[in-house]
């Protein structure tokens, strides 16, 4: 009988489920239900069948568990045996998590607000545990993770994973997971943590008037989230094509009422191929989640043919993004650098640069914590004469301040053509109060 002990004070934590019993069940399931175990990582019905088998065939291992905890313990056992263990529990219990990594010694958990070492039950996080976890991910997508195949890149559900085998590290295997959920992380309600409200209004008119935009920043600054927010302002009558190598934006589920094609690269199809294909589908917008190489040249040609583009790239600042486009174009094409850069400066309208900073603050109880803040550092307007600052935000000496510049007559004329107007307010070193964020030094 399951859960013979109830309400007697014996509240055994299911994370302490006997490892030997776990291993016994694991080996037995592999021998008796090998195909079902494989299916259970991807198929919910197979996972439920595994739960039924465990409950039916292994009651002796659950005799000392409180009756009201048995289902939770079985769920834990299943997550360890056929799921992704601590990873799926973290994702389920902490919906704000964006990144989980293992550096060979510690499991690091990160969200938009914090970065910390995962300490609970850390005795479980061993090299063997992590390697087994990576191999589950690899198997799920039809790849191997072995000394002969030491680098693994893959996508499993909402998780993007990269792992390097201990064969090629100084120590244990390493792993990085990016968790992408189908929601609008940056939105109107929390926008003021990112930039002032008048910039949110600016984003709307920029998209309504169909401007070409480059979003730059380091890894982890939130470029994709800005791209998704901008996408939210695309009108139904402006067909959009989203091109990405991994399913990060989830634009089809986020914006079911928009006319959007959502394409993925892979199986021999490149970003370049999909840009060329996009031109045959009569879109107003071509959105490319990230530029990395020679596909940049075809993207520029799409702009020159009258299509509108929003894309992201790695660049040190918004001012150098046009030069980065030139250099990436050169990877696959012979180009006249000066002429190409002039085209970029003339036909791309704005550059947005994003930064992130870790600040000292307090939680709701007053406890000192460190918080990751992603913020809009700069907006520039491009022209053949150069870059004009539109907005700039800085973090200095424990304070966020922002200033505004000017918008060109050409931009105002563009708005007037579609009966829109926008006045950029004037600010110089204005202190930016971030909602819910009290910074201490």
From Swiss-Prot:
Domain of life the protein comes from: Bacteria
Pfam families linked to this entry: T2SSE (PF00437)
Presence of the UniProt keyword Metal-binding in the record: no
InterPro entries associated with the record: P-loop_NTPase (IPR027417), Sigma_54_int_dom_ATP-bd_1 (IPR025662), T2SS/T4SS_dom (IPR001482), T4SS_GSP_E_ATPase (IPR050921)
Keywords, ordered alphabetically: ATP-binding, Nucleotide-binding, Plasmid
Binding site for ATP: 217-224
Record's keyword annotation contains Transport: no
Name of this chain's protein: Uncharacterized protein pXO2-25/BXB0023/GBAA_pXO2_0023
Organism listed in the record: Bacillus anthracis
């Amino acid at each position: 009988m399951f859960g013979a002990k109830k309400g007697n004070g014996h509240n055994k934590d299911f994370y302490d489920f006997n490892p030997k019993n776990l291993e016994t069940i694991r080996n037995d399931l592999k021998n008796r239900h090998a195909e079902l175990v494989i299916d259970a990582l991807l198929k919910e019905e197979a996972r439920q069948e595994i739960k039924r088998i465990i409950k039916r065939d292994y009651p002796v291992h659950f005799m000392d568990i409180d009756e009201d905890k048995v289902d939770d313990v079985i769920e834990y056992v299943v997550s360890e045996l056929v799921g992704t263990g601590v990873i799926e529990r973290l994702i389920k219990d902490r919906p704000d998590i964006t990144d989980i990594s293992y550096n060979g010694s510690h499991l690091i958990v990160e969200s938009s607000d914090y970065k910390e070492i995962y300490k609970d039950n850390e005795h479980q996080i061993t090299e063997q545990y992590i390697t087994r976890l990576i191999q589950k991910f690899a198997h799920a997508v039809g790849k191997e993770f072995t000394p002969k195949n030491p680098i693994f890149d893959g996508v499993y559900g909402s998780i993007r994973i990269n792992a390097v085998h201990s064969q090629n590290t100084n120590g244990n295997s390493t792993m990085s997971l990016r968790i992408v959920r189908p929601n609008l992380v940056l939105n109107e309600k929390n926008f003021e943590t990112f930039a002032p409200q008048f910039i949110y209004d600016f984003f709307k008119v920029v998209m309504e008037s169909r401007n070409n935009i480059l979003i730059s920043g380091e890894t982890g600054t939130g470029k994709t989230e800005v791209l998704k927010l901008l996408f939210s302002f695309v009108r139904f009558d402006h067909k959009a094509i989203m091109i990405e190598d991994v399913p990060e934006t989830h634009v089809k589920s986020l914006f079911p009422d928009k006319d959007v094609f959502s394409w993925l690269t892979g199986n021999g199809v490149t970003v370049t191929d999909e840009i060329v294909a996009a031109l045959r589908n009569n879109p107003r917008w071509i959105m490319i989640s990230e530029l990395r190489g020679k596909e940049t040249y075809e993207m520029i040609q799409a702009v020159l043919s009258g299509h509108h583009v929003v894309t992201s790239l790695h660049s040190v600042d918004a001012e150098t993004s046009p030069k980065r486009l030139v250099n990436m174009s050169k990877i696959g094409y012979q180009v006249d650098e000066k002429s190409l850069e002039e085209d970029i400066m003339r036909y791309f309208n704005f550059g947005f640069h994003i930064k992130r900073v870790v600040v000292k603050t307090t939680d709701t109880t007053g406890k000192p914590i460190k918080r990751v803040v992603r913020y809009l550092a700069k907006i520039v307007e491009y022209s053949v004469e150069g870059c004009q600052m539109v907005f700039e935000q800085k973090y200095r000496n424990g304070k966020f301040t922002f200033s505004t510049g000017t918008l060109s007559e050409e931009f105002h004329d563009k708005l007037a053509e579609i009966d829109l107007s926008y006045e950029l307010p004037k600010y110089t070193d204005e202190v930016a109060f971030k909602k819910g964020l009290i910074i201490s030094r």
